[in-house]
Amino acid sequence: MTYPKPDQMLTVRDSNFIFGSLGTGDAALRINGISVPVWPNGAFMGWLPVPPDSAPRYELLAGNSTATARLTLPVRVPPVPDTTRRDPLVGDTLNPVPAPDTILPVPGNVYVTLGAPASAVNDTDRVTIARPAPGNGQEYKWFLFPGTVVKATGSKKASGDDFVRVELDSAQESWVLRSELQAQNISSTAPQTFTGDSIAPVRRVGTVRIEPTAEWIDIVIPITGPPPPYLVEEGERSISLLLYGVTEAPVISMMPQPADSYLNSVSSTPEPTRVRFGINLNRAPYGYLALWQNGAFTFRVRRPPRIADPAAPLRGLTITVDPGHPPAGATGPTMLYEGDAVLEVGMKLRDLLTEKGANVVMTRTTSDPVDLGLRPIISRRASAHAFVSIHLNAFPDGVNPFVNNGTLTLYFWPQSIPLGVATQAALLSELGLRDNGTKFQNIAVARGTWMPSILTEGAFVILPDQEAAMRTPTYQEAYARAILRGLESYFTSLARAQ
């Protein structure tokens, strides 16, 4: 049995999948009296009612003309929600219970300092993530520098974590994990108490400089005081940079330079307690970095690479290939591990890219685990021109695998959509599976901003036929070839726009 494991808690009460391998395709299988399909390699996948509370187990009976075998698989099922009313009686003593959405206020003016996550290596990619609301599943909207000072106004527990409400300026609130405040701001004896300065930081913007180079354009914004909170938003041919909690409208000075083929103009609009910069481009945004260095906020706009030969669009470019996992990862019915399968695809893709003249950066070439947050950092440090993370998909409990399967490509930033669309089209052509689209998803490896970054879910490793295909060099090669075609299509489109 691959899934579920003995005594595993299921998270649904109606129907769920069960899969594993009989070791031979020459057998029939019934689970709890229901016939379950068996593939030629012995893998099986069933979509069955969840066992009742009174008999929480799967009874498997497999057999052919010569032998039979039985297996009892105990599982745990979630309890039935208690809908019994319990109205208080006269004379009952009731203890006040805070409402689940209660926000505990922080009294007075307390300004706290953000730090990088406790597990982070010191690197410019390491930021504190701020959300519009507390809890998991919320939008990751702001990516704030370590050392940013903000006002703490409230706290709340959500999704099992402690969150702090902070003001980016007087008109904008957001939420950060309590663990991402610097240690001196957190009371060790009173978890909901915060300590910090009582006076707001003063941030003044100086004269802005524009410093173009061959590969990027730096917009250098001198600021007195600590780094400001900021927000970056992309347009079709523009980037908006909003700095919170700053005063004085900046004066922009253009460095002596010839007409720039990529940067059209930079403008600034002062608003109460903030300044908005409009960066207008002659082409779509390709990549950028926000940097805090030497008392200045530097916004680095990356130029698209110049394609010397449109017939060989990858020649001379650097491509990061990221075989997903370990740690974690899904396992198929016959125990094909996702991390092993995508490593084979990644190595084949490396060879194909090399043949096309690309420089290839591999985030891993062995089965040793690589930290999730380190993968995009490896790519940025190599100044790669694209990042592709290779995965195989699986399902959460309660999703019917016979209805919901196919090929999917994911992105985080809008600049990555064209690469995602081109790669998804090639995957559909090569792998021949259902189109699950090119979609936004909050995935860590695709949150790097310096280059287009995507994650591919080529097939479902837990489906017997797709797992069997992924064991073959032919299908692995098809997966790799699809990504190559997507990259070629994307960079060819950049060549046309030069």
Spell out what each predicted region is.
Residues 142-148, 339-347, 351, 355, ...:
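Solvent-exposed, polar/charged alpha-helical surfaces in well-ordered, non-transmembrane soluble domains
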Residues 5, 11-13, 25-28, 37-320, ...:
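Short linear recognition/processing motifs and adjacent strand/loop elements at protein termini
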Residues 182, 325-328, 365-370, 392-397, ...:
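Solvent-exposed loop/turn segments at secondary-structure junctions
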